[in-house]
Amino acid sequence: MTDKYAVFGNPISHSKSPFIHGQFAAPTQELLTYEAILAPVDGFEASLTAFFNAGGKGANVTVPFKEQAFALCDSLSPEAKLAGAVNTLSLLADGTIRGDNTDGLGLVADLIANLGSLQGKRVLLIGAGGAARGCILPLLNAGIAQLTISNRTHTKAQLLVDIFTSVDNGAFANRVTAVEMNELVGEFDIIINSTSASLAGELPPVPAHIITPQTVCYDMMYGASVTAFNQWALSQGAAKVIDGLGMLVGQAAKSFTLWRGVEPDTQVVLTLLRDKLKAEPK
């Protein structure tokens, strides 16, 4: 029997998820289909219910439905609870829905694949939206020494700090801080741009002196060419830049494993996807 999976979003035609999951399934002999479903902005719950009623086993969720998906879940992973959003839904045997957030896990997996252990690293996270919030717990659990969050609206960065310093009786209290963008000083091992500024060819207003010859810069955005943020980072002398394509594949792999109990080969799929991206018409 072939199991049914899907990704819900609006818009959704650009989604790489059907290609990625198809590539994951092929060498593992997993019998499944995976489609992209355009849900009306005001009709996500109805679309999801219809999908599950028609035999759907699990689903990914993208913009703008991650918070709605969170609200529909009967149970949540620790990552999803703290992210306040869900990108992976699983229909359990008892008919309940479990929600996971694999975005941050995908980011960490990609960072480790590129850099090795994150233990003791000093990380600057630019942005304080949903993408930033979803990666904080996985980064802290990966053993980073310090996480500095900086955002145009400082109160949003401070809100994230308040959320995560209250976790586990303050277990992370000394490792997460918020700093105004124009007050950033010191050296960071890794700088992560979680904003979508690169999509418009723009840069977050951070000072150039935060980049040193040892700094690795990571842009969650990706494209056929180097992103605007990563181009800027290289021009300021960054040691290495990485885009978010590996995070996309990584989060998909975590979803696939949750559903199927099988760990797919991400590097093969990442190479295929990179080649596919470069071949697309500009």
Curated annotation (Swiss-Prot):
One of its GO terms (biological process) is amino acid biosynthetic process. One of its GO terms (molecular function) is shikimate 3-dehydrogenase (NADP+) activity. Pathway: Metabolic intermediate biosynthesis; chorismate biosynthesis; chorismate from D-erythrose 4-phosphate and phosphoenolpyruvate: step 4/7. The keyword Oxidoreductase applies. NADP(+) binds at G127, A128, G129, G130, A131, N151, R152, T153, H154, T155, K156, M220, G244. Keywords: Amino-acid biosynthesis, Aromatic amino acid biosynthesis, NADP, Oxidoreductase. InterPro entries: Aminoacid_DH-like_N_sf (IPR046346), NAD(P)-bd_dom_sf (IPR036291), SDH_C (IPR041121), Shikimate_DH (IPR011342), Shikimate_DH-bd_N (IPR013708), Shikimate_DH_fam (IPR022893), Shikm_DH/Glu-tRNA_Rdtase (IPR006151). It catalyses: shikimate + NADP(+) = 3-dehydroshikimate + NADPH + H(+). The active site is at K66 (proton acceptor). SUPFAM superfamilies: Aminoacid dehydrogenase-like, N-terminal domain, NAD(P)-binding Rossmann-fold domains. Coiled coil: none annotated. Shikimate binds at S15, K16, S17, T62, N87, D103, Y222. Its EC number is 1.1.1.25. GO terms for cellular component: cytosol. It is an enzyme of class 1 (oxidoreductase). NCBIfam families: aroE, PRK00258.1-2. Homodimer. Involved in the biosynthesis of the chorismate, which leads to the biosynthesis of aromatic amino acids. Catalyzes the reversible NADPH linked reduction of 3-dehydroshikimate (DHSA) to yield shikimate (SA). Belongs to the shikimate dehydrogenase family. This is Shikimate dehydrogenase (NADP(+)). It comes from Shewanella sp. (strain W3-18-1). The gene is aroE.
